[in-house]
């Protein structure tokens, strides 16, 4: 199996190096990742400037773009025979609503858009000490994907608690939880007394009960959430039809 490995923390981040070292024991792995930290980049693209790929001494390829750019360039030009896209290991969790903003999840999503199964993996914790735990869990899951391939419209979002492997209780298949709204943006001033603004702290869990990714992590389990690329709210189609078809555009 040939893997295209990317991330959103940047090509020099510890997480991608640890994951590469584990995956390369079992698979052929090529790394194409942003040249800088792109956390929160979501599915953004670089459209107004050309992309450049720089080959680094360790064999990784650095791209002056976003995580989505990196996967698109890697799979369409640099390594066109890849079988799987893996994104991570992200520094910090991607739980619940985080997935909407995550460059890690976006990199995996782009892999699916390019016709490949894809996996996003994040280390859930504040200390970032046990990347190896997440790397080993990811490698084991990928091995199972050989015989249990993902449906064409799905990716796997993996979150692993920041604990030693021996303390990990297991793996749970979960749904996304939800957060409370983030705190208000913080207004400050720069040295020239001009107003600047910083995003507030993420909201705490609003829906973090049993069965959610939040609950799994809080109880010492790795969380695996299948995500669909189709954002259609299928359950609402008939209801909206019922009142929208009566709309008279000539009124």
Curated annotation (Swiss-Prot):
Where is the protein found, in the record's own terms?
Answer: Cytoplasm
Respond yes or no to whether keyword Cytoplasm is given for this record: yes
UniProt-listed SUPFAM superfamilies? SurE-like (SSF64167)
What does the UniProt record say this protein does? Nucleotidase that shows phosphatase activity on nucleoside 5'-monophosphates.
* GO cellular component terms, A-Z: cytoplasm
Q: What is its main location?
A: cytoplasm
Keyword annotations: Cytoplasm, Hydrolase, Metal-binding, Nucleotide-binding
Matching NCBIfam families, A to Z? PRK00346.1-3, PRK00346.1-4, surE
What is this enzyme's EC? 3.1.3.5
Catalytic EC class: hydrolase
**Top-rank lineage group of the source organism:** Bacteria
List cofactor names only. Answer: a divalent metal cation
Annotated catalysed reactions: a ribonucleoside 5'-phosphate + H2O = a ribonucleoside + phosphate
Q: Which organism is it from?
A: Colwellia psychrerythraea (strain 34H / ATCC BAA-681)
Family to which the UniProt record says this protein belongs: Belongs to the SurE nucleotidase family.
Q: Which GO terms describe its molecular function?
A: 3'-nucleotidase activity; 5'-nucleotidase activity; exopolyphosphatase activity; metal ion binding; nucleotide binding
Q: How is the cofactor bound?
A: Binds 1 divalent metal cation per subunit.
Which residues are a divalent metal cation-binding? 8-9, 39, 90
- Its recorded name reads 5'-nucleotidase SurE
């Amino acid at each position: 199996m040939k893997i295209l490995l990317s991330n959103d923390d940047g090509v020099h981040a510890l997480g991608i190096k640890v994951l590469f070292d584990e995956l390369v024991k079992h698979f052929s792995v090529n790394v194409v990742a942003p040249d800088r930290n792109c956390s929160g980049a979501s599915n953004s693209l670089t459209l107004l400037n050309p992309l450049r790929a720089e080959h680094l001494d360790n064999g990784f390829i650095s791209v002056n773009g976003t995580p989505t750019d990196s996967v698109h360039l890697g799979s369409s030009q640099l390594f066109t025979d890849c079988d799987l896209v893996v994104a991570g290991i992200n520094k910090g969790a991607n739980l619940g609503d985080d997935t909407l903003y995550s460059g890690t999840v976006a990199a995996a999503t782009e892999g699916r858009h390019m016709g490949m199964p894809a996996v996003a993996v994040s280390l859930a914790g504040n200390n970032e000490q046990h990347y190896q735990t997440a790397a080993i869990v990811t490698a084991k899951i990928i091995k199972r994907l050989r015989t249990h391939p993902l449906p064409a419209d799905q990716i796997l979002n993996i979150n692993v608690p920041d604990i030693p492997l021996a303390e990990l209780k297991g793996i749970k298949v979960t749904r996304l939880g939800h957060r409370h709204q983030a705190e208000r943006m913080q207004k400050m001033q720069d040295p020239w007394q001009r107003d600047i603004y910083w995003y507030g702290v993420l909201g705490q869990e609003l829906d973090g009960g049993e069965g959610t990714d939040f609950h799994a992590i809080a109880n010492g389990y790795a969380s695996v959430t299948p995500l669909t690329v189709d954002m259609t709210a299928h359950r609402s189609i008939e209801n909206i039809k019922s009142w929208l078809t009566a709309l008279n555009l000539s009124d």
